[in-house]
Curated annotation (Swiss-Prot):
Sugar attachment sites: N141, N190, N212
Keyword Transport: no
Name the UniProt record assigns to this protein: Dimerizing cyclase phiC
GO MF term set: isomerase activity
Region (Disordered): 20-39
Top-level taxonomy: Eukaryota, Fungi
Family as reported in the entry's similarity comment: Belongs to the dimerizing cyclase tstC family.
Biotech utility: Phomoidrides A and B (also known as CP-225,917 and CP-263,114) are potent inhibitors of Ras farnesyltransferase and squalene synthase. CP-225,917 and CP-263,114 inhibit Ras farnesyl transferase from rat brain with IC(50) values of 6 uM and 20 uoM, respectively. CP-225,917 inhibits squalene synthase with an IC(50) value of 43 uM and CP-263,114 with an IC(50) of 160 uM.
Annotated organism of origin: Fungal sp. (strain ATCC 74256)
Enzyme class: isomerase
Amino acid sequence: MRLTRSLALLSACTLAAASTQQPLTDSDGHPKPDPPPYEFPLKFDNPRTDCKYVSQPWIADIFKNIANDFADVFKYVAPDVTFRIMGHHPFAGAYSNPKIAYINSLHRLNNCLKDNEVDSKLWAIHGGCDSEWTIMELYFNATTKRGLPWELTSLWVSRWDEDKLLREVRTYVDAGQIMRTLWDNEIWWNSSDRVTHYDIMPGPGGLPPGINASLEVDLSEELQEL
């Protein structure tokens, strides 16, 4: 008898909790992305600008539109940068050239999204100023070409020099989200952070506008000199 009452009480509590929860899907039945945990605009825990390396406000200005204008970030990448996308997923690996990293990852991902449009926000910046190391938390939001809501969180662990150039980058992303996005929108392949990438693999969408096939030859010659 007590067990029956306990089960009835548990069922009633479960139904009451479910009735107060916000719906997890939109009107079309698509899952809703979780809201960003940070407030905008970005608040700096160290707003100083008289820094030995890079200041947090300076980083925010450079990375404010990384999803749609990665070329602006390229200007602050050292030619011999060590760039590694961590994990075990299609984008993972070591890249000796940041352009290859961009084409094989962000550009390829953009080709899976509606109108190639991505809303990117810098959630938080940690470190920097008199420390050569920084951590940037980035949030990306878009709609896939299949019409599904899409979001991705990325973490950049970066080392800068006194000339404000990126010398080392380790970036962490949601591997499951990347694999689902590519699986749903193109032919899927895999990789790991133990692989060194020397070839351009932008995916079925091809190269970014303004970059032609000669880039492959130029990059090959450049890599042979390393």
